[in-house]
Amino acid sequence: MRVTTSFPLGTLRDTPSEAEIISHQLLLKGGYIRRVNSGIYAYMPIMLRVIEKISTIIEKELNNIYCSKLLLPQLHPAELWKKSERWEGYTAGEGIMFNLKDRQGKEFGLAPTHEEVITSIASEMINSYKQLPLCFYQIQTKFRDEIRPRFGLMRSREFIMKDAYSFHSSKEDLASFYEKMEKAYENIFKNCGLDTVGVDADSGAIGGAASKEFMVTADAGEDSILFTESGSYAANIEKAVSLPSKEIPLIRSHEEWIETPNQKSIVDICQNNNLDASQIIKVVIFLAKFEDKSEVPILACIRGDQNINEVKLFNLINKKYISNLIHLKIVDDNAIINKNLINFPLGFIGPDINDETIKINSSWDKSWIRIADYSASSLSIFVSGGNKVDFHKVFRAFSFIEKKFLISDIRNAKKGDCISQESNEELKEKRGIEIGHIFQLGQKYSEKLNAKFSDKNGQLKNLWMGCYGIGVTRIAQAAIEQNHDENGISWPIQISPFEILIIPTNLKDPIQKELTQEIYEEFISNQIDVLLDDRDDRAGVKFKDADLIGIPFQIIIGRDSINKEVEFFSRSSKSKIKIASKNLLEKFISESKVMYNKNS
């Protein structure tokens, strides 16, 4: 292709102010995307080639495990999502689904995911175990009503995604296919030239028994990954489990009151009372809002030197109670004032606080849901709130508290924790960008949408399901996070918009022009993915743009063209050699083969 006739470049000289991270900056500066509105981007021709190459890699691997490609509607009727009991959670409050009503007043949503639609289709087309297993996939645009779109294509309102859905006759068959998909994902990311790590993950709003995320390690990542150096364990921080450090024993012979004027924080209490944070149980109050409109106060206890993992807490509450949990929020001073909770001792609450403290409130449930992390429930002697302002007290043991607690892991694992009693391996931490997620959904959706099949004995059974997502546009941006320098992008060759860029420095020179045409035609005839920068512009501008857009190899045609010689430049290694034009194709094939093998 030629820049002047079929592939215009839209590079920028200045970095757009809204771009916070380097990959977003380079996508905009390189002319790959154009901002239309907050979180909404146009994919320019050069970006579309990257997307198409990623999509081709994905399709090849999925076709290898007998997945069938289809295209599902983006506009979903609300009744399907109400059957799965996800409509309220996805549309109310801080829900992420764009939703609307048509002129008949019927409700619809713009799809962030397609479990409901594909399950509805499966319920109509799958009748017998003889049709199973089946897997369908699509690559298309998804929508999320992000509260704060940021980081370009990392967190946008509109994005391209591959989502696949599998149907099975048994839990064992689902698990077997899940492993095949996991291997396919590893191949996909390797063939995209990415350095990824698979981690145990929370299933979130999608649900299911097991899930795994695939992360590109990068400083700009929004997710924290905890892992061991040996590679024996890796998990997203939302899912990670570990053992906290040992507490420092508190030496007190009996229960006693401690006056703590204006000492609401753990730091203040420790500094003023010669205590260590591990000797304190902090109590955090949450308000849980359920789909049935009920509001239930949550009393969560954890050791003072640890932090509550709100994802673990949310999932625990959601599993234990019948109605779907929609929202979980920390109760602060403003909430107490708004609810007119008189003399509510926020900041001084202990695990033994009575239900009477909340019975005055008309909208809240009249009793606490009490939850304690293992780090709190295992303490023998500790300090916690005294349930009256400016006072804490010493407790003899958590087990002596005459209240019913749900004991579970609601703690944030962190760097430096040991992974188990049997191992001294400590957790390390790094940042990651999620580019893929696979789930064993089980029968969650088939039960609610009545998707059944007839087994070998003629009995009707619910289908077993899996779902598998890849962020196509995220892969493109994540690849830039891993492959750039001070001059611009340095694409892995597998997903680069072109394999090689020809840069004539002066096309007004007839010798350069003739040699340029010869080289271009030779590469085209050998089916090399080549771009010719035939703009009537200064050589310096072309060189700067070439480094910015990041095509792996450059052929620079200059004054030595009179001797049929050119320069061959590798963008990643920055090596440049002078070479006879007759040897150029052979050189490119050799160098590109090395790069393909290195990145796959």
Swiss-Prot record:
Family annotation (SUPFAM superfamilies): Class II aaRS ABD-related, Class II aaRS and biotin synthetases, YbaK/ProRS associated domain
Principal localisation: cytoplasm
Catalytic activity: tRNA(Pro) + L-proline + ATP = L-prolyl-tRNA(Pro) + AMP + diphosphate
Presence of the UniProt keyword Cytoplasm in the record: yes
Enzyme Commission number, as recorded: 6.1.1.15
Uppermost EC category: ligase
Subcellular locations according to the entry: Cytoplasm
InterPro entries per UniProt: aa-tRNA-synt_IIb, aa-tRNA-synth_II, aa-tRNA-synth_II/BPL/LPL, Anticodon-bd, Anticodon-bd_dom_sf, Pro-tRNA-ligase_IIa, Pro-tRNA-synth_IIa_bac-type, Pro-tRNA-Synthase_IIa_type1
Alphabetical GO biological process terms: prolyl-tRNA aminoacylation
Key words of the record: Aminoacyl-tRNA synthetase, ATP-binding, Cytoplasm, Ligase, Nucleotide-binding, Protein biosynthesis
MF-aspect GO terms: aminoacyl-tRNA deacylase activity; ATP binding; proline-tRNA ligase activity
One Gene Ontology CC term in the entry: cytosol
Pfam families (alphabetical): HGTP_anticodon (PF03129), tRNA-synt_2b (PF00587)
Family note: Belongs to the class-II aminoacyl-tRNA synthetase family. ProS type 1 subfamily.
Domain notes: Consists of three domains: the N-terminal catalytic domain, the editing domain and the C-terminal anticodon-binding domain.
UniProt function note: Catalyzes the attachment of proline to tRNA(Pro) in a two-step reaction: proline is first activated by ATP to form Pro-AMP and then transferred to the acceptor end of tRNA(Pro). As ProRS can inadvertently accommodate and process non-cognate amino acids such as alanine and cysteine, to avoid such errors it has two additional distinct editing activities against alanine. One activity is designated as 'pretransfer' editing and involves the tRNA(Pro)-independent hydrolysis of activated Ala-AMP.
Subunit structure: Homodimer.
The protein's name: Proline--tRNA ligase
Organism: Prochlorococcus marinus subsp. pastoris (strain CCMP1986 / NIES-2087 / MED4)
Gene name as annotated: proS
